[in-house]
Every structure is written in structure tokens, then in C-alpha cells.
Amino acid sequence: MTNTVFRGESRDGHVMRVAVADIYDELLLERIRAESGCRIIPVQRTEDEIRRMLRADAQRSSEALLRELESGKKRDASSDSMPVISLVDSILESALEQGATDIHFEPDSQSFKVRFRKDGLLHDYRALPAWIAEPILIRLKLLAQADITERRLPHDGSFTFQGAHTQANVRLSTLPVQYGEKCVLRLLPTNDDAQTLDDLEFSPAIRQAFRNAFSAPQGLFLITGPTGSGKTTTLYAGLREIIHRDINVTTIEDPVEYTLHGANQVQVNEKCGFTFATALRSVLRQDPDVILIGEIRDSETAQIALRAAQTGHLVLATLHTNSARAAETRLQDLGIAPKLFRESLIGIVAQRLLRKRDPQSEGYKGRIAAVEFLRPDGTYVDGDLKENALRLVREGVTDMGEIARVFGS
């Protein structure tokens, strides 16, 4: 697990006190002993206590680095100086430790703000001095192999960050704004515990409907919802139910966000003309059994997907609509005949992510998907989207304030 250990400092070079969640984890203690060369004194702490220790340590580290930069900023504030490199690493480490999905670097006239997106909302991390913006952005662009000389145009890139406990794929996006460049990093941990349908906490009836859909020999299964509503997570959880079978699974994504062992993952590149439709045509020549399409964006992709679903392939895809019923209208707008759509359809799911109440505080911790599962005959499995969201309120998982935030008053 990510937060099972917090290492103290060795005062004499021979003995180190270490906070651990499990003092009987001999493999962990032996690894720390080998890496540090010290005799280890384990001190048992809860996971939450260790998280607080890690947050405080990261804060102290970044403050010390800033003091170091402040003291010599005129001579050593370049992007390749150790303090700048360490500060960037410290910010990334803190974001991963706090479970953030995105980091926002935002310049204004007085400061360079850093914010973390956690459980769907942005939270202030800290305000850095404005002069540090340029070396931090250059450092991030170098990591992502983006052009450091051009600040007037947006840039995209990616890199891998190895933290103390977690490795993450990082997607970078920059945008010219009034006071410089805004940068957003999307964090995609590579060693998260793989979620299954059981982990997603659906009702028993909806969970079984998912399993039936993913076991179908052919047809079209859609998941709809806005960006960031967990559509890919749900599709991957379903694929993990079947990927061990003797089948050929291929995904077409933009971009590939998570590694799915046992699947052939294809990343489209529209700048080079390798679109979803182009990729889908090629995949159909690869003898696929199951095809996941990251998003049906255009008429051509929709037409090919429907034909594939009618010719012996299980096709899983996402759409951007507000409800399951709106998916048919969206496909009609893309030129799909209603009769053809209904003949191929296995089911449509719409979902939203709601923050979960934290029993240890008055706030929230983690998120859960509220879903509706629409059958081909137009009936719902276990209620529509808002009914299932209200069920989560009755069960004490979330509250009405969160319902109002996500669905509106």
C-alpha cells in the first residue's frame, strides 16, 4: 500500500525509528534496513497518521528548498539546478501522496499558485513566488520533451515520475495566459490496485447486469457521462472480468491512460492522421473478439463500430451525453439509424462521480459512481441515475449537498 511507512532520520548513523502501519511486516523492515544501513526501530502508527506525517514532511521539504532558492536565486534558479529539480519532485510527490489526479500551476501578477485536484475539486496547495515560475515550467517541459523556447503556443507532452511509493505517468499541457504560462499535469498512477466491478460498489442487480454485458458474444455496450466521470475506470473494471479468457482484446484510446495487462492498447494520433476510425479499421483486421473504443466522436467511427457489433465482435465505447437515453439521440446525430442501433445494443450506462462522506471528519474522502443501466427494451436496472444517487444518500455514503453540487439544485 502507498502509505504504510514513514522513515525518520538516523541521529547517529546507526539507529533509525520508522513509523509503519504493520510492525510485523518483516519484508518491509528488512528492505528499509538494507537501504539505510541502520538498525530499525519500528513504531506502529495508523494509515491516517502516516499520511499526515508524509504531508508535513513534504511541506517542510518544499519550504526548505524555497529558502535555498531564495538565498541564491540570482545565481542558481535555473531549471537544471538541484533545488528546482527537488522542488518539482516534492510537488509531484505531495500530489501523489494526497491522491490528487491533477496539478495546476497558475501564474498571476504576484505569485505562482499550485493547486491539486482531489475528489473532483481543486484545493490550494501553496503559492510560490512569481520568479520561480519560469524555472519550474522549463523543468516540466524538459521532462515532457516539450519545446522550452516557445511560450506563445500551447504544448503537450508526457513523462514518467517515480515517487517514493508510487510511479505515475504524467501528461503535461501548457497554455499561454495573461501572466505567463499555465501548466496542468494529469497524474496516472501505474501501480494502483486494479479495480474490479466488485470494487466499484454498484448494487447487486447493476453489477450483475454489467457482468452479463461483458460476457455477451457480440453487440454494442455504451457508457456515457461528462469528462472525468469515471467511464474508463468502469470499462477497465469490466474488461478485467473477461480478459483472462482465450480472447483477443484491443483498446483504442486517446491517450492510453492505464496499462491493462492482457490487452493490446492502441493510442490514436490525430495529428498524424491516425484517428479512431482509422485505428478501428486496422483493429478489425487483427481478428479481435472485444474492442474498446475510448470515445465515439464522429459519424465514421460510429458507423464502423455498429458494423463491428453486428459481425461477431463485442464493442465497448464511451459517449459524451448527460443520460443513457440521450445516447440514442447522439448516435442519430452521427447518422446511425435507430433500428440499426437497437438491433446491436446490449445496454447503456450513464454515470457521475459523487464524493463519499468521511466518517472520521465532517468532510469527504474518496468518490463513488452513481449509475443508471438502461436495457435495450428501454427499462432501467434498479432505477435511473438520480434514484441511485439518492439511494447512496439514504445509505449514508454521500449527502444531499453533494447531490446538489453534481446534479444541480
Give the ranges of each region predicted by the language model:
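Polyanionic, low-complexity intrinsically disordered segments
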Residues: 1-35, 155-164, 169-175
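Core recognition of P-loop NTPase motor domains used across DNA-transaction enzymes
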Residues: 2-11, 27, 31, 38, ...
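Long, low-complexity, intrinsically disordered polar/charged segments
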Residues: 6-16, 70-73, 283-289, 308-310
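Short glycine/Trp-rich loop-beta-loop segment that forms part of the substrate-binding cleft
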Residues: 17-60, 201-212
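Generic amphipathic alpha-helical segments used as scaffolds and interaction surfaces in large
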Residues: 19-20, 41, 78-82, 394
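Charged, low-hydrophobicity low-complexity segments
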Residues: 44-93, 98
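Short, flexible helix-loop junctions that flank or precede catalytic/ligand sites
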Residues: 81-94, 98-409
